[in-house]
Amino acid sequence: MSTATPLAPTPVTTTDVLIVGAGPVGLFAAFQAGVLGLRCELIDVLDRAGGQCTELYPEKPIYDIPAVPGCLAQDLVDRLLEQCAPFAFPMHFGQRAESLSEIPRQPAPDGHAAHERLLVTTDGGKRFDVSAVLICAGAGAFAPQRVSLPEAPALEGRHVHYAVRDVSRFAGKRVVVAGGGDSALDWALALRKVAARVTLLHRREGFRAADGTVAEMREAVAAGEMDFVVGMLGALRTEGQDGPLTEVEVRTRDGSTVLPADELVALYGLVSEPGPIAQWDMDMRAGRILVDTTTYESSRRGIFAAGDIAYYTNKQKLILSGFHEAALALRRAYHYAFPEKALVHVHTSNNAALKEKLTHA
């Protein structure tokens, strides 16, 4: 009689603060955590940092950031990444915060109750043991717009993908990348280096992507390094009822065509939804998290919110408001991470070690 070997549990990452969302507010929060001496890690459902600024309007001008008369949304993200880079906090992309539970601790030797910690698990299986969670998820978790074909759900996660988490899984495969934005073109260009063949599929000749990226794609097509087809997904064909993907049927202006395919990467853009966070037993208002404006803590101890996801009277949906909210939230979170320490305010310019880190990164 044989017995199956049990799967090893996913390792748990222990840190002080988990920041949910790597948009502008989440990135500034990471910088603030570093300034305060907090360890942190960031997760985001997207495949890169920047949130809405990167995915929806990278070329949008922004004029209301203090001391920055004007910049493009992507430029702001790039500057925030540069600002928090000295602390080298890990960022985990393609990960949606899924479940939250409390980790009871044994009483301390002196008889005082130990601080309860939190365990956050993502849909990708990552687990984080933290003192506090700061949710900077904008209007909610951005979820990919899914393929609407009836055969798609059974193939999701196996042969139909909405993000590229591991390039190596596409090595030697015939890949169709569907979409017309920056993500679709970027990944089509990247995957052509490892895949047997890449075909970019878009419903029209024009793209919602940077001119330079479009030019690079057209050069790759002209050089025979990849293919480009104008059309829309019509059907997904498999080998048998539950077998792997073999072909993608495409509806074109002249009828239809069939593309050989082992993998489909659909990058149609994003839709906003509260996601599992809405089930974390916090007081919510219209899909946003009700917070105390003294600390920006939610009704659940140790869970904070900053940015558009936070709700309070006279809330202003401005990036600069999110910066302020994150800064105050982390100062309260510090007391959960280090209950025995007093947080002493120090100007960054007067802290020699911090100044050295920030100026010589």
UniProtKB/Swiss-Prot annotation:
Cofactor dependency: FAD
EC number per UniProt: 1.18.1.2
Keyword terms of this UniProt record: FAD, Flavoprotein, NADP, Oxidoreductase
Residues reported to bind FAD: 44, 52, 57, 97, 142, 308, 349
Keyword Flavoprotein: yes
Enzyme class name: oxidoreductase
Catalysis performed (reactions): 2 reduced [2Fe-2S]-[ferredoxin] + NADP(+) + H(+) = 2 oxidized [2Fe-2S]-[ferredoxin] + NADPH
Keyword Flavoprotein: yes
Entries under Pfam families matching the protein: Pyr_redox_2
Cofactor details (free text): Binds 1 FAD per subunit.
Gene3D superfamilies, sorted: FAD/NAD(P)-binding domain
InterPro entries (alphabetical): FAD/NAD-bd_sf (IPR036188), FAD/NAD-binding_dom (IPR023753), Fd--NADP_Rdtase_type_2 (IPR022890), Ferredoxin-NADP_redctase_2 (IPR050097)
Subunit structure, interactors included: Homodimer.
PANTHER family (alphabetical): THIOREDOXIN REDUCTASE 1-RELATED-RELATED (PTHR48105)
Annotated HAMAP family: FENR2
Protein name per its UniProtKB record: Ferredoxin--NADP reductase 1
The species this protein was found in: Cupriavidus necator (strain ATCC 17699 / DSM 428 / KCTC 22496 / NCIMB 10442 / H16 / Stanier 337) (Ralstonia eutropha)
Lineage: Bacteria, Pseudomonadati, Pseudomonadota, Betaproteobacteria, Burkholderiales
